[in-house]
Amino acid sequence: QAAVGTTWTWTAPATDYTGYLVDVYRTKENGTEVILGTIAVDVSSDWTRFPRYGFVATFDASKKVDGVIEKEMAFLNRCHINGVQFQDWHNKHHWPLGGTREHLDEVYKDIANREVYTEVVKKYISTQHSLGMKSMFYNLCFGALDDAVSDGVKEEWYIFKNTGRMDKDSHDLPSSWKSNIFLLNPTNTEWQAYIAQRNDDVYANLDFDGYQIDQLGNRGDRYDYDGNKVNLPKGYASFIEAMKQKHPDKRLVMNAVSSYGASQIAGTGKVDFLYNEVWGDEAGFKDLHTIIKANDQYGNHALKTVFAAYMNYDKAGSSTGEFNTPGVLLTDAVIFALGGSHLELGDHMLCREYFPSTALQMNDVLKTAMIRYYDFMTAYQNLLRDKDTEAEISVSLNCTDAARNLSLNA
């Protein structure tokens, strides 16, 4: 189709959930085509059919500067990111909104005592919506800070490390942070009603599209207030059901940390795709294939998989610098070829489970490669990620012993 001037208009075919690759080229006098550029197009009525998930994690005064948010989101848009997770945006885990339903705080502190500006959160949401992205707020399914009793959280809702009610289960944090996080029973219906109402306060004031639910993996034996052993995976399913019942029009995604509770999460039929945070015991490329195959069964062949796989994790924990470009690209090539997606792009590139960490940066080569890789994943999504497109082939590689042990931390 010929373009006139510097613009080009195209009406997509009516077929839903289809990826396309657009080539922009000119033809020389001898008939040779010269490619000027390429870009992918995703024609889908629902973003969760082929989720390409990003994140934002800093909401301080630096984001109020004109053009900062727009530039960040323009890059995500160019990479076809269609959903964005808001990490560490909340005031308290048991009271996520900064302020009250009736009166929002202009600025409040997150769990690490960083400043969060409500206007920045709102601007991220509105900018994402203007680009066709969806905005998902993050929170644990069972977290409360040390002042929770003053906000109406009851002692009977917690889980404990023993049957004596003396030692609440907790996720301990640095002393400079706001509080440790104390864990509640996700099955407890009173807690479910409480946090669902807090979420209602959020939705009433901030135009989020859904809830990115988190957990903390296998905690070992834990007990409720009455001394009964708690079945956390069953509790996660119950929690998801309760959140969907309270807000049926909002999207839900839940993290399966090291695949813990994955089958129960998927089995609810209430999450929109599957999300796996992978750790050292499942950080090989073969493990990713195993997870995707399992998720496909858990989700009845209907739910896609997004991996939270932190690149150059060890390096980011001990130094600063740049990402290992070949390692990132090889990992993405594997994940995309397996039919998954990689949570990695946001207001920076992700390297640690603490999303605000900016220890490592993308160089220009990696930034350019990200655009090309995400173009490819989007354009060929029907081959890579659609139903019944898996093919088994035999591959033989000659490589060094070191290369045989490639992992996500490459």
Residue ranges and their predicted role:
Residues 1-46:
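Beta-strand-enriched, solvent-exposed domains that form extended recognition/catalytic surfaces
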Residues 34-92:
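An acidic-aromatic substrate-binding cleft motif
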Residues 45-66, 135-206:
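Active-site-adjacent "subsite" loops/lids of carbohydrate-active enzymes
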Residues 52-55, 84-86, 135-138, 211-213, ...:
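Hydrophobic faces of well-ordered beta-strands that scaffold small-molecule active sites
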Residues 61-78, 191-205, 257-265, 324-332:
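Short, acidic/polar
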Residues 90-121, 149-188, 217-234:
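Aromatic- and acidic-residue-enriched carbohydrate-binding clefts of CAZyme catalytic domains
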Residues 184-303:
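Active-site neighborhood of glycoside hydrolase catalytic domains
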Residues 254, 268-270, 284-410:
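Active-site-proximal substrate-binding groove within the catalytic cores of carbohydrate-active enzymes
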